[in-house]
């Protein structure tokens, strides 16, 4: 046990942690030359293409140092803000962390939030400055930032390059020297912390865990504490690039368990595994249910695919327990599901995986967040969907979720960023200068304002330099109203949204203009209206396509022409009564892209 080192890598998106992990694997000869490819640990094609890590991964390396063999378990974590619960569980399974900072970009918001998480878990932190081979690297300035953040001596900061492999030996040596061996009692009742699960179509759900106390052996009868379910450990083993079965896994080590579990609901990240015969008295602290933050309706384009969509979502859920869904129906789109996601990136990824892995064409409605409605009778109702709002006469007030956000940016962009946050009803809490030209701004913002396009706008006004991190803070009463879109007087439920009263008129007007561009012209006029309750706040009209019926009259009496025009008008009127307006898929998504 004294030769085991468990560590994770903390970094902001794009600071090169997956590449550096590749170098560590190559250097310790964990991965043979023929298996080597970029981002070895990222299994999904989607992860490689986008260059992001979505799920946590784990891999075991062996390293000889001063004549002794050490086992290093690297637990790779996602860097994106949507997946911060996965990061927190991975961090809890480690004793040390490599803090990777890009020598060209410096410290970013995500780095800081994950670093605080590591410090709370008492991890030994090893600062590494990556990408020092870049021509745009600023090693001295970035070193100043790291020293200021960690308060460590300058000579402790390792310089490395994931691309050239420079500094990799120093990193491995430092891990062995500085990261403490896992603490734990091999004789105590079994306690294993689950930090991830993956779905294998042949063997069911495979849980990855770290043994905190005790020893787990093949064939043991075990119990998952949070769900209370019992299983037999058909196979346990360690994680190299592939799984290597072992007879037992001892205290402090990281491994996997296969026990024929069918659904991901039964394996919760953060849960504890213990023996049925000699159970641990309590679970490992820190387990929490992940609550979805963003909700959207997902509908099949062809309504006959409803059952296929259900099956696809269930399969996705096997691999991604944070995805929730329940059936709902819409007059405009037919039957579909109301899905809950951790954030916008998570939503995009689920959509893309539905398309790639299951060939499902889906329509997604406007994402919204959950609100708490207080009725005049004193009841509290949680609403995920604007259609679920009770009658306005019964509502006392509505609470909406607020987040606490921190934005790190160059001082050049402070003005535009503050304007953006104020436009999103943000409240400035404080601003702190990290170094001469970098500042951290703290805001309280309503989650509903951020959910659509805040991140994209932040990136574009700061030329990609600003970084953003947030966590849910609390619920606060707000003046919200349900905005309906009517086409020829008929409400289209899939386009309804909840907006703040102050922004509703401009939002309604922009929405109508956008829909006017996207809905194709018909044989009759189409009125697009935005309404709050019975009050119309904006209107646009799509003019009818019409034939020149008087073309065949040359000269002659005006009454002849009038007769033909009246006849056409009658026909158009009749068409309008029975005609329906097709809303194209583009129009549902356009709402997300209103500027």
From Swiss-Prot:
Residues reported in the UniProt entry to bind GTP: 14-19, 130-133
Enzymatic reactions: GTP + H2O = GDP + phosphate + H(+)
Topology of this chain in the membrane: Peripheral membrane protein
Enzyme class: hydrolase
UniProt cross-references to CDD domains, sorted A to Z: EF4_II, EF4_III, LepA, lepA_C
Pfam hit, one: EFG_C
Keyword set, alphabetical order: Cell inner membrane, Cell membrane, GTP-binding, Hydrolase, Membrane, Nucleotide-binding, Protein biosynthesis
InterPro entries the UniProt entry points to: EF-4 (IPR006297), EFG_III/V (IPR035647), EFG_V-like (IPR000640), EFTu-like_2 (IPR004161), LepA_C_sf (IPR038363), LepA_CTD (IPR013842), LepA_IV (IPR035654), P-loop_NTPase (IPR027417)
Main localisation: membrane
Statement: the UniProt record of this protein carries the keyword Secreted: no
Localization terms from the record: Cell inner membrane
Name under which the protein is recorded: Elongation factor 4
Enzyme Commission number: 3.6.5.n1
GO biological process terms held by the UniProt record: positive regulation of translation
UniProt record similarity statement: Belongs to the TRAFAC class translation factor GTPase superfamily. Classic translation factor GTPase family. LepA subfamily.
Listed PANTHER family: TRANSLATION FACTOR GUF1 HOMOLOG, CHLOROPLASTIC, TRANSLATION FACTOR GUF1-RELATED
Superkingdom of origin: Bacteria
Entry GO terms, CC: plasma membrane
Gene3D superfamilies: 3.30.70.240, Elongation factor 4, C-terminal domain, Elongation Factor G (Translational Gtpase), domain 3, P-loop containing nucleotide triphosphate hydrolases, Translation factors
Function: Required for accurate and efficient protein synthesis under certain stress conditions. May act as a fidelity factor of the translation reaction, by catalyzing a one-codon backward translocation of tRNAs on improperly translocated ribosomes. Back-translocation proceeds from a post-translocation (POST) complex to a pre-translocation (PRE) complex, thus giving elongation factor G a second chance to translocate the tRNAs correctly. Binds to ribosomes in a GTP-dependent manner.
Domain annotation tr-type G: ranges: 2-183
GO molecular function, one term: GTPase activity
Organism phylogeny: Bacteria, Pseudomonadati, Bacteroidota, Bacteroidia, Bacteroidales
């Amino acid at each position: 046990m004294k030769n085991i080192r468990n560590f994770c890598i903390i970094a902001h998106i794009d600071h090169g942690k997956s590449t550096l992990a590749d170098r560590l694997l190559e250097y310790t000869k964990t991965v043979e030359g023929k298996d080597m490819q970029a981002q070895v640990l990222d299994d999904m094609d989607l992860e490689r293409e986008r260059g992001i890590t979505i799920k946590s991964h784990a891999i075991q390396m062996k390293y000889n140092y001063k004549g002794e063999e050490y086992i290093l378990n690297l637990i790779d974590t996602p860097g994106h803000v949507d997946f911060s619960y996965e990061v927190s569980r991975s961090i809890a399974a480690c004793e040390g962390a490599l803090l990777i900072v890009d020598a060209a970009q410096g410290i970013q918001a995500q780095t800081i939030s994950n670093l605080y998480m590591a410090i709370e878990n008492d991890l030994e932190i090893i600062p590494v400055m990556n990408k020092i081979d870049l021509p745009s690297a600023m090693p001295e300035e970035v070193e100043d930032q790291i020293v200021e953040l960690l308060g460590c001596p300058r000579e402790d900061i390792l310089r490395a390059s994931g691309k050239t492999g420079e500094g990799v030996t120093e990193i491995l040596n430092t891990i062995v020297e500085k990261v403490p061996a896992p603490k734990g009692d091999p004789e105590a009742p079994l306690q294993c912390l689950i930090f991830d699960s993956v779905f294998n179509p042949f063997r069911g759900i495979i849980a990855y865990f770290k043994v905190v106390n005790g020893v787990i052996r093949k064939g043991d009868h075990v119990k998952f504490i949070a769900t209370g379910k019992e299983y037999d450990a058909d196979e346990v083993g360690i994680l190299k690039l592939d799984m290597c079965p072992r007879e037992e896994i001892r205290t402090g080590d990281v491994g996997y368990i296969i026990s024929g579990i069918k659904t991901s609901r039964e394996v919760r990240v953060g849960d504890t595994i213990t023996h049925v015969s000699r159970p641990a008295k309590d679970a490992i602290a820190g387990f929490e249910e992940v609550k979805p933050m963003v909700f959207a309706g997902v509908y099949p384009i062809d309504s006959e695919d409803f059952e296929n969509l259900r099956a696809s979502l269930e399969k996705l859920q096997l691999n991604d327990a944070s995805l929730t869904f329940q059936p709902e129906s819409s007059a405009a789109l037919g039957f579909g599901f109301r899905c809950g996601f951790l954030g916008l990136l998570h939503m995009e990824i689920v959509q893309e995986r539905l398309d790639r892995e299951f060939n499902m064409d889906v329509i997604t409605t406007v994402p919204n967040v959950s609100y708490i409605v207080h009725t005049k009778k004193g009841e509290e109702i949680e609403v995920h969907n604007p259609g679920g709002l009770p009658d306005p006469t019964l509502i006392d007030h509505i609470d909406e979720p607020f987040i606490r956000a921190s934005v790190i940016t160059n001082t050049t962009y402070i003005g535009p960023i503050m304007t953006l946050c104020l436009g999103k009803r943000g409240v400035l809490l404080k601003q702190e200068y990290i170094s001469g030209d970098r500042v951290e701004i703290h805001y309280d913002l309503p989650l509903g304002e951020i959910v659509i396009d805040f991140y994209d706008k932040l990136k574009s006004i700061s030329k990609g330099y600003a970084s953003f991190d947030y966590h849910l803070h609390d619920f606060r009463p707000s003046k919200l109203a349900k905005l309906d879109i009517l086409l020829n007087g008929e409400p289209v439920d899939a386009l309804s949204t909840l907006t703040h009263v102050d922004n509703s008129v401009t939002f309604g007007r922009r929405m109508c203009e956008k829909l006017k561009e996207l809905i194709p012209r018909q044989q009759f006029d189409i009125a697009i209206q935005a309404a709050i309750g019975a009050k119309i706040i904006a209107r646009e009209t799509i003019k009818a396509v019409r034939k020149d019926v008087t073309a065949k009259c040359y000269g002659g009496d005006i009454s002849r022409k009038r007769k033909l025009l009246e006849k056409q008008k009658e026909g158009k009127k009749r068409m309008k009564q029975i005609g329906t307006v097709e809303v194209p898929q583009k129009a549902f998504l356009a709402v997300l892209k209103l500027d």
